[in-house]
């Protein structure tokens, strides 16, 4: 979901573990030379999803990295397969009320219409939960979510050793 804390939490956890962090949207902007809004305006949703999928393939080849994908990554089934083949998928489940109450997100166009964000959550929740290897509930404060994510990452690291 947009605004659920993927990038913020991902950066903190990657830093804590001494790993690299990639925000997939930033990667898309870097590779395309256009911001996300420009890509949507020029290519539409379908065109953006193709670019996003191509960038995900690039990112999936990287090692020892924590990735924050865009919230719509799960709308393309092949993307779920790519993510699961290249690593573990963690869904950060943040209640819509918490997303909407975060004043630092007020500039995001998608979050201006409360009805749309609830609809988006309801449309995607089953995809998020079914594609996730782990679910981190981001209900309380950021520190609690970071602690949960570090526990998840340590489990993953133990499995890989």
Language-model features: locations:
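ATP-binding Walker
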Residues: 4
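NTP-dependent small-molecule kinase module
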Residues: 12, 16, 88, 126-161
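Short, flexible helix/strand-to-coil boundary loops that buttress conserved ligand/catalytic motifs
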Residues: 32, 40, 52, 60, ...
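A glycine- and Lys/Arg-enriched "phosphate-lid" helix/loop adjacent to the NTP-binding pocket
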Residues: 86-127
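Walker A/P-loop
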Residues: 7
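ATP-dependent small-molecule kinase phosphotransfer cores
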Residues: 23-82
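P-loop (Walker A) phosphate-binding loop of NTP-binding proteins
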Residues: 1
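Short glycine-rich anion-binding loops that position phosphate/pyrophosphate groups of nucleotides
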Residues: 71-73, 95-97, 141
């Amino acid at each position: 979901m947009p605004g659920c804390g993927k990038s913020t939490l991902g950066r903190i956890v990657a830093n804590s573990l001494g790993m690299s962090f990639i925000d997939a949207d930033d990667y898309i902007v870097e590779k395309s030379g256009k911001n996300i809004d420009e890509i949507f305006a020029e290519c539409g949703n379908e065109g953006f999803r193709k670019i996003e999928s191509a960038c995900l393939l690039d990112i999936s080849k990287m090692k020892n990295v924590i990735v924050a994908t865009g919230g719509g990554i799960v709308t393309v089934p092949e993307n779920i397969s790519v993510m699961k083949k290249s690593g573990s998928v963690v869904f950060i489940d943040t209640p819509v009320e918490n997303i909407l109450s975060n004043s630092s997100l007020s500039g995001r166009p998608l979050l201006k219409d409360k009805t749309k964000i609830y609809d988006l959550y309801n449309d995607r929740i089953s995809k998020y939960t079914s594609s996730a290897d782990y679910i981190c509930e981001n209900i309380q404060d950021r520190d609690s979510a970071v602690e949960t994510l570090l526990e998840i990452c340590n489990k993953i690291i133990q499995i890989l050793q």
